[in-house]
Amino acid sequence: MFTGIVEEKGKVRYIQLTGESGILAVKARKVLEGTRIGDSIAVNGVCLTVTSIQPDGFTADVMAETIRRSSLGSCKAGSQVNLERAMAADGRFGGHIVSGHIDGTGVIRSMLREENAIWVSIETSPQILHLIVEKGSVCIDGISLTVARVDEAGFQVSVIPHTGEETTLLEKMPGDLVNLENDLIGKYVEKLLGIRKNEEEKKESGITMEFLEEFGF
């Protein structure tokens, strides 16, 4: 589990794609502290397993599903990435619950300055957008941010100077892809409400869990 508080900006050494999967090598320092092979590091919000460690970096396998759902496939040598180690059991919880299993990507629509903050507007799919709520949490490229506004096609967040300096978000341009993970609690609530709705529909039809168990299902 992660918190969405980026520990450092790393730099992609290379990404080797073989078919739909590959190997990602990242130059880093801070996230190597205490890290062992098999540990998890979030790279732009994507949970990856460390497969080898060097004095100034690490490598990780990137699966086909990760390439399909994320923007990691578009990384190249020199690309800056946000890095965070999985949270220790006694670690400080600074952001929100982040699984590192992203839901998809969004496209930056615009970036506008207002005094000391930057408004970042992101367009995304209806499947992701319907779980994004104003004043709720969203993880963008591994960064825990608060949703300020939601519209029919996307949403906006306000990025403070510290977040801009410590992450890669403000280095991006309109049209660039970002990885998105919806609030995990919201996803569980939606799932439970869906189950309850299905149960109510089954009761109306006379088919309940008790009915199915009674007849051996």
Predicted stretch roles:
Residues 1-217:
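Conserved loop->alpha-helix
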